Amino acid sequence: MTVRVHLVRHAKAKNRAGWTEPDALRPLTKRGRREAAALAELLRASAPARLVSSPFVRCVQTFEPLAEALDIAIETTELLAEGADGGGALDLLLSLSRGGSVGCCTHGDVLYAVVRTVTTTGVRLDGPLDVPVASAWVLEVEGGQVVGGTFVERPSR
């Protein structure tokens, strides 16, 4: 059975340059909130059984509209936090996929590392490694291995 892992890069956050508090607290912009709502509409039909996110505010906020629409809680893990190891994040995704379809929200560096790692195993993925905010990779998992994936561009704002 093929299980889908929706690996989402968080929506547009406030600019780092003007942010004086810890980066983990940096929230979405108004545009980011619109992107999060559009992502919720896009992913809602897939009805992931779980939503797992980086604990950074911008990632949790990206999944809030989807969590509300599906009436499920957002779980957080440091394994999806900015700067996390891509191999550890991929292991987490594969583990989570054993329970069915899952949505995971992370950061550009982690998403890049996961997708790059998948491609080094010989899986062909058509799409960018470095993805823009509010876009995603839908990875297809069978037997605990990624067997394919589809890039999903960010929804129009």
Please annotate each region the language model reported.
Residues 119-148, 154:
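Domain-level recognition of soluble alpha/beta enzyme cores
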Residues 85-102:
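Internal catalytic or translocation cores that form aromatic/hydrophobic pockets or channels
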Residues 2-87, 124, 131-134:
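Active-site-proximal alpha-helix that buttresses catalytic centers in soluble enzyme cores
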